[in-house]
Amino acid sequence: MSKYEEKRQLKCSFCGKNQDQVRRLIAGPNVYICDECVELCDEIIQEEIEDTIDEDTTSLPKPKEMMEILNDYVIGQEKAKKALSVAVYNHYKRIYSKKSSSKDIEIQKSNILLLGPTGSGKTLLAQTLARTLNVPFAMADATSLTEAGYVGEDVENILLKLIQAADFDIEKAERGIIYIDEIDKIARKSENPSITRDVSGEGVQQALLKILEGTVANVPPQGGRKHPHQEFLKIDTTNVLFILGGAFDGLEKIIQKRGGDKTLGFGAKIESKKELDLGKLYEKVLPEDLLKYGIIPEFIGRIPVLATLELLDEDALMQILQEPKNALVKQYKKLLELDDVELEFEEGALRAIAKKAIERNTGARGLRSIVESVMMETMFEVPSRDNIKKVIVTEKSVNEDSVNPIIVLKDQEESA
């Protein structure tokens, strides 16, 4: 057989067509595939990708469903919950759509800024969302961060926490959520760019810019500072959702000065910070206000979604104590139930706990420490005694350190 005839015998190993029947025949080790079969394979793969996108999008909770889940754990803050639900849904929808072959429109990432007083639920909102979506979650405190080369934590260490939360599964970590608290503490020390180095303020903002937008970062696997002889973990932050939280103490003055709240001028009533409704005032915040506060323009541009949280009042704190799925009252009742003891909180006691949290300016975050101090002596005593039927926490036991909750013995209740 001539070489020409041998060439004519070459055929696609999949469809059986000869070389002269197709535009191109691609050769592999003892196998051939034609351009038509390549196109067909590509179509099949794309169909499968579209199916997985549909499955992913179907399993992703809709904004209303996310809101319902948040309602189980977070009391109040309706506007913030709605804004978060929409932003998070759009973020993960964007990730799944990237699997598609469509390149016509690129949806940009929308990081989120939660602006609200201490103890208003910023951290809890972020944690609950991560748990709902079953994605890795990492928390960091902006106050510990410094610019690379200075004493403190590098921003890459935040990414290491996320990788650790994903059990070092990089692909999983790249779809995670990072919450950075106290972001207001890295504000520039003055509104104007400084000649001297601001390593814990503007320097940190500059260092965070790349990972907020999306970059392939080199992360030291053991944490700490980078050195040239160590191996690095590479993580792409393009699809990592960053939620930033801060109390932004003093921002209300900037908003008022701009005229965002009509409390200035002749005849205006001067209100103290406690009298001001910070939640409503913060709703009027503009990028220029954050700029004056000390957040650099590039940083503001990378956090397009802004959600404000309200200051929690006495009634809201009482609800937080009792209503969420993991409410503090339910937790302490469960703890005593394990010792076969019933626990009751009088309404006056709950209100007294809420008042103490407001006085301490700790919001919901301070509730646990107050309840813990009230219950300490009782919880020390109860496990050692088998004749206790019930414990009643009264208003007096909350307000007076020398008064403990009432202990009801089993024989006392029977005689009553």
Curated annotation (Swiss-Prot):
Residue span, ClpX-type ZB domain: 1-53
Pfam families per UniProt: AAA_2, ClpB_D2-small, zf-C4_ClpX
GO cellular component terms attached to this protein's record: HslUV protease complex
Taxonomic superkingdom: Bacteria
Residues binding ATP, per UniProt: P117, T118, G119, S120, G121, K122, T123, L124
Molecular function via GO: ATP binding; ATP hydrolysis activity; ATP-dependent protein folding chaperone; protein dimerization activity; unfolded protein binding; zinc ion binding
Keywords attached to this entry: ATP-binding, Chaperone, Metal-binding, Nucleotide-binding, Zinc
Single Gene Ontology BP annotation: cell division
Assembly information from the UniProt record: Component of the ClpX-ClpP complex. Forms a hexameric ring that, in the presence of ATP, binds to fourteen ClpP subunits assembled into a disk-like structure with a central cavity, resembling the structure of eukaryotic proteasomes.
HAMAP family hit by this protein: ClpX
Similarity-based family: Belongs to the ClpX chaperone family.
PANTHER family associated with the record: ATP-DEPENDENT CLP PROTEASE ATP-BINDING SUBUNIT CLPX-LIKE, MITOCHONDRIAL, ATP-DEPENDENT CLP PROTEASE ATP-BINDING SUBUNIT CLPX-LIKE, MITOCHONDRIAL-RELATED
Role played: ATP-dependent specificity component of the Clp protease. It directs the protease to specific substrates. Can perform chaperone functions in the absence of ClpP.
Name the record gives this protein: ATP-dependent Clp protease ATP-binding subunit ClpX
Lineage, uppermost ranks: Bacteria, Bacillati, Bacillota, Clostridia, Peptostreptococcales
